[in-house]
Curated annotation (Swiss-Prot):
Site (Important for structural integrity): 27, 145
Assembly with partners or alone: Homotrimer.
GO molecular function terms listed in the Swiss-Prot or TrEMBL record: amino acid binding; ornithine carbamoyltransferase activity; putrescine carbamoyltransferase activity
Keyword Transferase: yes
One of the GO biological process terms: arginine biosynthetic process via ornithine
Gene3D superfamilies: Aspartate/ornithine carbamoyltransferase
Annotated pathway: Amine and polyamine biosynthesis; putrescine biosynthesis via agmatine pathway; putrescine from N-carbamoylputrescine (transferase route): step 1/1
SUPFAM superfamilies: Aspartate/ornithine carbamoyltransferase
Organism, as annotated: Latilactobacillus sakei subsp. sakei (strain 23K) (Lactobacillus sakei subsp. sakei)
Protein's recorded name: Putrescine carbamoyltransferase
Protein residues bound to putrescine: 271-274
Catalytic activity, EC: 2.1.3.6
Subcellular location: Cytoplasm
Catalytic activity reported: carbamoyl phosphate + putrescine = N-carbamoylputrescine + phosphate + H(+)
Amino acid sequence: MKRDFIDTKDYTQAEIQYLIDLGLQIKKDIKAGDYPQLLSNRTLGMLFEESSTRTRVSFETAMTQLGGHAQYLAPGQIHLGSAESESLGDTAIVLSRLVDILMARVATHDTIETIANAATVPVLNGMTDYNHPTQEIGDIITMAEHLPAGKKLSDCKVVFVGDATQVCVSLMFVATKMGMQFVQYGPKGYQIKPETLAIGQKNAEVSGGSVLITEDTDQAMRDADFVYTDVWYGLYESPLSYDERMAIFYPKYQVNDELMAKAAKHAKFMHCLPANRGEEVTDSVLDSDASVAWDEAENRLTAMRALLVYLMAPIIDYSDDTLNNLKDPALKDLLNNRIDSTK
């Protein structure tokens, strides 16, 4: 049975931990010069309704590094669900006959669900108006790489500063799934909606994590291990003007040296990028030693490699020769012990 990656709610804590381990293992091997050809002769179809830098480049690079190929499919170049063209469902069915896996970055969550329901190959959500799950995996990998001494993920506190964007919501999903303390520090009217917050609270009940929404600076930042923000204007639709948005968030919700000083001394700064320097974050923070934003961007690639291998593993019959040719036995062990709660 095929599995999609539309929302981390469909994945267990153990499966997400497996994706972390798999991603870091492949990253380690590639850094050592070993490019495991796990996706040889496989093709990824990439559907983009929205523009992208990190998502597109990381998926294309991941496929190339692992021996496969990626095709970029823009709405103006193919028939994609408009009134004058093929339906979304029919497009997904056709593409399923031509590629091995699909990724779509689309404007609405209904669109990705329509594609996933019709496709007969695995479908990855490259971002919708609701969530950004591939970013979630890159983020949790980054936090796993930069854990404070003596701490596990479940011991850590992550604070999202600002508006309840798709990235904020997605960070809550994965942090609470992994037993972390999640805080959104943002103004009323721009906080996570109750029905969405309930998902994080349910995750926390199971994992032992916690969720807090607050406007109190000291309460939010106290003992924070990771401080995360996203843009205030430009990437997301808003009826407000630039000046109106700035008046809501600036200066209280800007991540600057003063705000970082309220977090734990070892706290790391994160940003999904692109950043509007001088708005949601200052140069002094983004370019500081505490910033792991560039590692986070690189780990989009780490996440994509893990997700592609994980989702395609059931349809690829790895021969003993392929596995035995892997230079690192740790990767072979991971592939032989794939965690899948659907089985």
